[in-house]
């Protein structure tokens, strides 16, 4: 439900940018161009609204976006605006995982932000509906809204339905894309045969939509709701569900209403809104990538969010959602029990949510929750706070002699509070994968993968291929993996990423050697290499040469900042 424009609406210019292309003698040529795409004399007083979509048919994540863009266009028209649609890129992490393509994943976030900025500024658009489906496209769109500070509404493509597989042994089970990565590890370890591997491959993606667990895409869709940048309830309906078309139409209406009220993205993206988003991520046990992305969105919004804010909130907010990759359920199940508003409502009742923040509806979060009346947690998919899965949030920031500027762990996956063991050091992911395939990874080891950070990778690759292979080979609870790279939202096991400073910046991880004892204490939020600092720094260091000397990743490596700052450029 939208708040109607107030009495002072007549004082607000609903065309704060586009008058330069629709009014006056100087706009003759631009009006002529706009007439060719369908505008006419009756349209010059209407606000021009960008419909920015990351649609493509490379990956199922984005297939619904063309349909949803049509709904958003219709909503803009209905509210008195004029929609102008354009597309930007999107990278499929599922397809790029485990090979050179993964270097290009995180940089795609920046390319998306830059490209949306470029079009909105070049074409003088007044507002924008942002549509995205795959992992990096969601934060990329939100970063663009924050940077430009225009009236903006975000809409998610929706998630995929789970697949179902029957194995040769007769076992039937629900599967997601993560099962395929783990099946590869199981196959290499001789635990399953090629026939079962093929059955899993054919079952994991039964249709359109983003990966179905509480992986990065669904985490960031939930974040968008919690920030107030999406209409409440819009994150959880599946991609193919026609409720999405209704949300698309309403999103188009909403952006015009925001213009009429003079509300822009930074009015919504306040420090309190980011605290709400962190609380939701902690309660859901969401992806560690949310740390990077929230820091980056906050940077664009000029909000002083730091990596330390995550522990401040996570130490108070329990983990209550039993969702994959560690739990039993997927986003479709969250939708079945009331969606993300159920989580926000539960958090608000416990005092973990700022209810007075404004949302894209023009109303406060508390008003929206009251109007929706989402009900209470069902006790299975979403637990109550009296019976949480874990007493603190699902993500923790660690600091210590190995990561003075911080590291990030998804603590929902840790069965042990303390892990201590000898380091097995690998320069880049491929070397670690080769060692695992050769059977050289031993129980009790701490696998250290370095030179995979934002600058050193470059691109801070996700380590899903190696972590899934570790789990598939039966070592998931017996080894700890540390990296200055990052992890997929679907990663399971004992994994700590985002170690900063990264190796290429001569962080302590660059000086670690095989056999060094590393100790992680989740309860104390500490991560240490048990070697005297002077001894560590005295070691000879020969970093590998830059992997890319031209192209987008060469540019990126020269601009990108630390993971502890959100890997911003």
Curated annotation (Swiss-Prot):
UniProt record, GO biological process: isoleucine biosynthetic process; L-valine biosynthetic process
Residue list for modification N6-carboxylysine: 136
Cofactor binding summary note: Binds 1 [2Fe-2S] cluster per subunit. This cluster acts as a Lewis acid cofactor.
Cofactor: [2Fe-2S] cluster; Mg(2+)
Matches recorded under SUPFAM superfamilies: IlvD/EDD N-terminal domain-like, LeuD/IlvD-like
InterPro entries in the cross-refs: DHAD_IlvD/Edd, Dihydro-acid_dehy_C, DihydroxyA_deHydtase, DiOHA_6PGluconate_deHydtase_CS, ILV_EDD_C, ILV_EDD_N, IlvD/EDD_N
Binding site residues for [2Fe-2S] cluster: 61, 134, 211
Single annotated GO MF: magnesium ion binding
Binding residues for Mg(2+): 93, 135-136, 462
Catalytic reaction(s) noted: (2R)-2,3-dihydroxy-3-methylbutanoate = 3-methyl-2-oxobutanoate + H2O; (2R,3R)-2,3-dihydroxy-3-methylpentanoate = (S)-3-methyl-2-oxopentanoate + H2O
UniProt keywords, alphabetically: 2Fe-2S, Amino-acid biosynthesis, Branched-chain amino acid biosynthesis, Iron, Iron-sulfur, Lyase, Magnesium, Metal-binding
Catalytic residues, chain numbering: 488
EC number(s) recorded for this UniProt protein: 4.2.1.9
Pathway where this protein functions: Amino-acid biosynthesis; L-isoleucine biosynthesis; L-isoleucine from 2-oxobutanoate: step 3/4; Amino-acid biosynthesis; L-valine biosynthesis; L-valine from pyruvate: step 3/4
Quaternary structure and interacting proteins, as annotated: Homodimer.
Function: Functions in the biosynthesis of branched-chain amino acids. Catalyzes the dehydration of (2R,3R)-2,3-dihydroxy-3-methylpentanoate (2,3-dihydroxy-3-methylvalerate) into 2-oxo-3-methylpentanoate (2-oxo-3-methylvalerate) and of (2R)-2,3-dihydroxy-3-methylbutanoate (2,3-dihydroxyisovalerate) into 2-oxo-3-methylbutanoate (2-oxoisovalerate), the penultimate precursor to L-isoleucine and L-valine, respectively.
HAMAP family xref list: IlvD
Homology family: Belongs to the IlvD/Edd family.
The protein's name: Dihydroxy-acid dehydratase
Lineage of source species: Bacteria, Bacillati, Actinomycetota, Actinomycetes, Micrococcales
